[in-house]
C-alpha cells in the first residue's frame, strides 16, 4: 500500500509537440466560456480541448466572447496548460428567445449552456459537465475551474462546485 501513495508533487508531461511540456498536475486550468467566431473544427462545442502553454494554439478562437479575453489574461501571467470548453452563445443555434420571453424575467443568455448536463441522445457531457470527460479526451484533469463572467450566477457557481468536488479541483468564482 505505501508504494501507491504519492509523496510530493505529481508532474504531467505532454510530448505531442516539438518539445515536451511539463507542468504540475494541480495547476491545470479548466476554462469554460463562449467564442462565437471560433473555428468549429478546432473548437467544437462542449468538447474538452487542450491548450498546452502557447497563445498560438488558441488563435482559432477569434476575438469575441469570454474565452479569448480569459486566455489572454492567463497567458499574460504564465504559460499555463488549459482545458478549454466552448459553449454556444445562446440556448442553441436556432433557439433564440422571443421578445416576450426575453423581458419576462432576468436576461441570462448562456447560463443554461454553461451549466450543461448530459445529452439524452448521445450521452455526451455538456457545459461544465464536460470537464468530467477531460481525462479521457485530452489526458489531463483540470484542477482549477473557472467560468469568467458567468460564475457570479449562483446556479453556475453551484455546478462548478459540484464538478470540482468530483474532480478534486478548486473553483475560482467572479
Regions found by a protein language model. Name each.
Residues 1-174:
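Surface-exposed assembly/interface segments
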Amino acid at each position: 500500500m505505501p508504494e501507491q501513495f504519492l509523496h510530493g508533487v505529481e508532474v504531467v508531461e505532454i510530448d505531442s509537440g516539438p518539445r515536451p511540456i511539463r507542468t504540475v498536475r494541480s495547476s491545470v486550468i479548466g476554462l469554460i466560456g463562449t467564442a462565437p467566431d471560433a473555428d468549429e473544427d478546432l473548437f467544437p462545442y462542449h468538447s474538452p480541448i487542450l491548450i498546452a502553454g502557447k497563445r498560438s494554439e488558441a488563435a482559432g478562437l477569434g476575438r469575441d466572447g469570454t474565452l479569448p479575453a480569459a486566455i489572454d489574461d492567463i497567458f499574460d501571467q504564465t504559460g499555463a496548460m488549459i482545458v478549454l470548453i466552448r459553449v454556444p452563445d445562446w440556448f442553441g443555434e436556432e433557439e433564440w428567445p422571443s421578445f416576450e420571453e426575453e423581458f419576462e424575467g432576468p436576461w441570462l443568455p448562456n447560463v443554461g449552456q454553461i451549466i450543461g448536463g448530459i445529452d439524452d441522445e448521445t450521452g455526451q457531457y455538456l457545459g461544465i459537465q464536460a470537464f468530467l470527460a477531460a481525462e479521457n479526451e485530452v489526458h489531463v484533469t483540470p484542477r482549477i475551474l473557472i467560468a469568467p463572467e458567468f460564475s457570479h450566477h449562483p446556479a453556475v457557481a453551484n455546478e462548478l462546485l459540484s464538478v470540482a468536488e468530483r474532480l478534486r479541483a478548486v473553483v475560482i468564482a467572479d
